[in-house]
From Swiss-Prot:
The lineage of its organism: Bacteria, Pseudomonadati, Pseudomonadota, Gammaproteobacteria, Pseudomonadales. It comes from the Bacteria. InterPro entries: NTF2-like_dom_sf (IPR032710), SEC_C_motif (IPR004027), UPF0225 (IPR023006), YchJ-like_M (IPR048469). Pfam families: SEC-C (PF02810), YchJ_M-like (PF17775). Belongs to the UPF0225 family. This is UPF0225 protein PputW619_1140. HAMAP family: UPF0225. It comes from Pseudomonas putida (strain W619).
Length: 160
């Protein structure tokens, strides 16, 4: 049992916060998943970062680059600005946040409006850096059974 404070900024202990998502419990909403992903970067949990990315994108992730960025950064904090649950089938959401870190090049901050989709009781991050080759009439990569244009297409490219 960990007695450390969760890196996500909630003020809760890791085991009572993001730690149980890292251990396999599905995050209940997109904001919880986003916070747990930030904590995973802080803790170097690369398998968790990959597993919580949309399955159709997982093969396109550069695990070594993710691990290097995670390890070479000192994580300074996370601010969640907004979480929008959009509903629908499957359910979609946006979470707007700013993450701060320090590396050899100095202090950085990154503001993003991330898109998420829920499938089979689990939330997944839709990674804007991983290309998907899905035509508008192709089956949606989130495995909803719908055409891409009726499901996740509008969530690609909607970043702040």
């Amino acid at each position: 049992m960990s007695v450390s404070v969760c890196p996500c900024g909630s003020g809760n202990l890791l085991d009572a916060c993001c730690g149980h998502y890292h251990a396999g419990t599905p995050a209940p909403d997109a904001q919880a998943l986003m916070r747990s992903r930030y904590s995973a970067y802080v803790l170097g949990l690369i398998d968790y970062l990959v597993a919580t990315t949309l399955p159709a994108q997982q093969a396109g992730l550069d695990r070594n680059a993710i691990a290097a960025w995670s390890a070479q950064s000192t994580w300074l904090g996370l601010e969640v600005e907004n979480a929008e649950v959009l509903g629908g089938q499957p359910e979609h959401a946006f979470v707007t946040f700013t993450a701060r870190w320090h590396d050899l090049e100095g202090d950085h901050q990154h503001r993003e409006r991330s898109a998420f989709v829920q499938h089979d009781g689990r939330w997944y991050f839709i990674d804007p850096t991983v290309e998907l080759k899905a035509g508008r009439n192709d089956p949606c990569p989130c495995n909803s059974g719908q055409k891409f244009k009726k499901c996740c297409a509008s969530y690609w490219g909607n970043r702040a």
